[in-house]
Each structure stands twice: as C-alpha cells, then as structure tokens.
Amino acid sequence: MSIKRSKLSVKALFAALLALVLVLGIAACGSSNDNGTSTSAGGGGGQIVSNPDNGKVTLTIGSKNFTEQIVLGEIYSQALQAAGYTVDKKLDLGSETVALAALKNGQISGYPEYTSTALTSFFSVQPEQVPSSPQQAYQESKADFEKQGLTAFPPTPFASANAVGTLKTTADKLGLKNVSDLTGQSQKLTLYGSPECRQRVDCLLGLQNGYGLQFKKFVPVDIGLRYTVLDKGQADLSILFTTDAQLAAPQDKYVILADDKHVFPAGNVIFVTDQSTAKKAGPDYEKTITQVQSGLTTKAMQELDARVDVDHQQPADVAKQYLKAAGYIG
C-alpha cells in the first residue's frame, strides 16, 4: 500500500524524531558511544556559560563542503559564540585537502575531520590498519597532527564511512549485497563519487586494489548530487556516506553494499585546530566542543542531516534547533 506524506507531516516527523534521538543520545552520554566503546567525550546536558574573557579571542571555524560538515561547523560556531568567543565562519571550503591547507595557512582556526580520513589521506595509513577503536584512532590522529603543530579534540559518538550505494531496484536486478558481488559485473557499471575519491585509498583506489574492481567509467560529481545521479539513471553506483539522511528516510529506496573486505574504515569526527590557537583560547575551547558534540549519536546526526537534505532547512537553523533541544543554549 502506498502512502503519500505531506510536506507538513514530514516536518512534524523529523521534529519528533530529532527530539527523541537527542533525549536518548544525551541521556547516554559518558557511558558508551555508537561503537560500543566507553567514551569520556564530556558535556552532556547543561547550558553553556559565557565567559567574558573569551571575547578577546577570535575563532574562525571552517568545514568541508557537504551537509554533515556544514551542520557540524554551525554547531561548533554557535556553541563557541555562546561561550563568549568572537566567532567567524568559513564553512563549505572544499575537500579535506583544502580544509587542512586553510588551517595550516591561518585562514581558519579549526574544522571537523574524520579520524579515518585523517589517517588514510594525510598520514599514509592503509584502510585495514585504521584502528577499530575510536579512542585509539583518535590518539593516533592526534599524535600525527601534533607533529605538524596542530592538535585534535576528542571524538564524536557517531562515526561515518564511505560506502558503495545503489538503488534497491539495481541491487535486486544484479544480485548485489556485498561489494565483492560486483566482481565480473563492475566493468559494465558506471560509478560516481566526489572528485577526491579517485586518489583516496578508502574510495576508488580501495575498490580497485582491495577488491580488484574496474568500472566502465568513474565520474567525479559534486557531493550534493550523489543521490541525484542514481535517481536519474546516470550512475549505476555512487559513493555515499553511512550517515547520509537519505539512508534514514522511511522509503527503502537506496541500499548500501556491505564492505566485506573492509576497505572503507569508519571514522569518528575530531575537531582539528592549531596548538597556538588552542593555548590562546584556553580550556573553554575544547570543553565547549566536546560538550556540544556529546549528544551526536548516529541517529541524531542522520536526523540533523535530514533536516537540511530532505526538509530543506538551513544548516544554521538546524544547528540552533539541536543546541536548544539539548539545553546547551537558551
């Protein structure tokens, strides 16, 4: 039976779901994260207290160029403003390479990065060598960043990974459940992914080297169009993120192929900043970041992403809704 949902009912659904996942996520803070590992991410409930001394410090918060990153950038920016800092924003910068370069040359004070991306893209760690423990992956990433005059704050509860996705109709037609099921079929299929995917070991290179797959064609595409090319039949396969809002929508339209050879390691988000800024900004800098991200479970992050990608709200508004619902701001 097909049920039509009005735009209003969809908004109401996401509002209810967001409130629920925030309550559950924050209640669980300090006990365990999404990977079942104990975490001391700190924070939880409690309103952010503004410190007048923080107003002497200006922080420029950056982000990469897709929904989840921009929402995180807004959450961090608004939280730091609430803590009394003077905050500028340079969100939607580009790929991880662009964001890290902006941090190193002083354009931004910090940005959210994934531990798996940091280890594989910046520090030459092979995907299968990325620690499965979020805390271990964080400690290794932090140690490598510190060699470059940077540092990183503790990880989010949620983790995200690249994934090969397709329409459910395509998966059913071709008998696809695992990525290895593409063996013998990939040369007839077109794969779309972000421009940097071509050079990443946890993306196209991993599919080629880890699975031995060759595709009919790889087409670089803007991250915001990864589902559009599937819907329009331009792509047979597309590189998706496991926290994408579209995968949480109640429609069973898209499927992710299981990464049975583990070339797509999951990564928790860490906030990367330079050591001099961290010292100048004082303890409220790290405290505020870890406090407001402590409620970001996988379900909470998917719902926040959905408010932007599905419900077409502005990232700044979504971030404010999250901070208010969690009690971080009044």
Enumerate the language-model features and the residues they cover.
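C-terminal motif of bacterial Sec signal peptides marking the signal peptidase cleavage site
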Residues: 24-28
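Bacterial signal peptide processing site
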Residues: 30-33
